[in-house]
């Protein structure tokens, strides 16, 4: 203990420490305000990380990021000939007077098809008369069959097929003739004697028997 003592030589010890505000040299960085656009202002000595170009908002009258002066982009007025000016005014008036076309509802498909059928059928007077006669005869025939079928609506609605009606009325011997002719319930209710001859029932006895049964339905 007697031999130990405090050293008398003074030594300077340097330690790492946080730099003060005065030593922050990176805060004095300048940015070209004409090429950088940013809206973050500067408050005191604190600068935003993105190096905002807005500086001294209170002292400067205009913002450095304000748009460029319009005077540099003003178009030089050119002299217009009176005739050319009148023509431009006429074109402008003509465009303003244009109105959209009136909206027309499309016609139904049936109204379009019917005139086409009439034109095709009446291309010549002979064919027109023949077609009209055929159409009237078909219309009359379909109307006659529908009227007769309506009178037998109960049978038509409650029977499964033609065979069932013939078996029920005792006409099972004629089932084959009706099936080969592909006669359905509506046609069965509106059959006439001439129709029976067409399906192969030529004898008067068969025709009379079938017609009597159909009339009693």
UniProtKB/Swiss-Prot annotation:
A motif (POLO box domain (PBD)-binding) lies at residues 39-41. Residues 157-217 form the SAM domain. Its main location: nucleus. It comes from the Eukaryota. It is found in: Nucleus; Chromosome. InterPro entries: SAM (IPR001660), SAM/pointed_sf (IPR013761). Changing residue 170 to A: No effect on degradation during the oocyte-to-embryo transition. Probably ubiquitinated: degraded during the oocyte-to-embryo transition by the anaphase promoting complex/cyclosome (APC/C) containing cort protein. Keywords: Cell cycle, Chromosome, DNA-binding, Meiosis, Nucleus, Phosphoprotein, Ubl conjugation. GO terms for cellular component: chromosome; nucleus. Disruption phenotype: Mutants exhibit a strong dominant effect on achiasmate segregation, inducing both X and fourth chromosome non-disjunction in females. Precocious nuclear envelope breakdown in oocytes, due to defects in meiotic arrest in G2. Residues 83-106 are annotated as: Disordered. The modification Phosphoserine is found at residues 63, 66. Changing residue 190 to T: In strain: NC303 and NC399. One of its GO terms (molecular function) is DNA binding. GO terms for biological process: distributive segregation; female meiosis chromosome segregation; homologous chromosome segregation; regulation of meiotic cell cycle. Polo kinase inhibitor required to maintain G2 arrest in the meiotic cell cycle in females. Holds heterochromatically paired homologs together from the end of pachytene until metaphase I. Haploinsufficient locus for homologous achiasmate segregation and may be required for the maintenance of heterochromatic pairings. Interacts with polo. Interacts with cort. This is Protein matrimony. It comes from Drosophila melanogaster (Fruit fly). The lineage of its organism: Eukaryota, Metazoa, Ecdysozoa, Arthropoda, Hexapoda.
